[in-house]
Amino acid sequence: AHPRIKSSTGFPDFYRDKPFFKSDRYLGGAWKAMPADLSRPRLGWRVLDLLDDMSNWGAKKYIVGEVDIFQVDRTTEFYGHANVNYLRLDQIPRFEDGWASVLKALRDGAFFLSTGEVLMPRFTIGGRQSGETLRVGSPERVKLEADLNWTFPMSFAEVVTGDGNKVYRERIDLSGTGAFGKQTLKKELDLKGKSWVRLEAWDVAANGVISQPLWLE
């Protein structure tokens, strides 16, 4: 639940080659914002760095947002530290239909993760969405499109890619935005030699939204 911290320090790195970790039933890791250092421009580096490392290991894993809720009553306040998963579903499932569609979306990487103040309702690269596989031909340049909605003015977005060894970041300046806005990002990417790609965007208060990886062949 809390990779690389507390009693999970050193994990899942330690068992990355074990069959149970490589199984498609092992989803990946969970993100609660700890440590939370607001002097940094982005939250979640502990878990997002793990997401990038797992992607470079060749493991198709994902990160879900979570929060510890031991008790809920009228005094409970968990909005400020509850990261939210927004699933790509055709319709909201009914209780009597069970959890199958929710679990499938999580397992397929068909969701984005938000701290709450920034949303990414649409994210495609070459027409493919997170969790899907894009076959990159020649030339290896493809178009990224992403819809962003936000509360506070935005600071930047980053296209994060990996080649199986290194992680690369390409920053998109969003400092000219105002509060309560929306924008469609469009950018042509050179994905030569890359094996995965994802997008994240952050506002001036370190609130952010993170796509799950899109896999490249």
Predicted features along the sequence, with ranges:
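Catalytic cores of extracellular degradative/oxidative enzymes
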Residues: 1-61, 74
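C-terminal functional module detector
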Residues: 37, 52, 56-63, 67-217
